[in-house]
Each structure stands twice: as structure tokens, then as C-alpha cells.
Amino acid sequence: MANIETYHAQVVGSDEELWNLKTVIARTGLSRSTLYAYVARDLFPKQRHLGPRRVAWLASEVLAWIATRPN
């Protein structure tokens, strides 16, 4: 748990919100496979690795991406 706290404080700042995969999928409406395809093609913000099997996205980056999408 200490690694996550350190990562959060040093890299994203203490006030930045992190979203897990489930939240990103719910907010964007993308499927898991489409989301990762977009990440691979630099069409979506990169995820941050919080541990060996845990990733998260900066909420601000995802919201900015959503704002650029046509309605």
C-alpha cells in the first residue's frame, strides 16, 4: 500500500483523482478492448501502473478526452 501512496503523492499530486478500469469504461462508454486499442494507438490517455496488476487513469485526462469527443 505504501507504494501506491508514494506514487500518488509524487507523480499525480495529492489532489488528483484516479479512476480504475471499471470507472473509465462506465464514464466513456468504451469497451475494454476498444479502450486498450485506443491507448495502444495514442488515441486515449495512458494508464498509470499502481502495482503489478493494477492500473488507473487520471480523472482529469479522461474527462479532457471525453470533452473532445463529438456528442
Predicted regions, residues:
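Short Lys/Arg-enriched helix C-cap and helix-to-coil transition segments
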Residues: 48-54
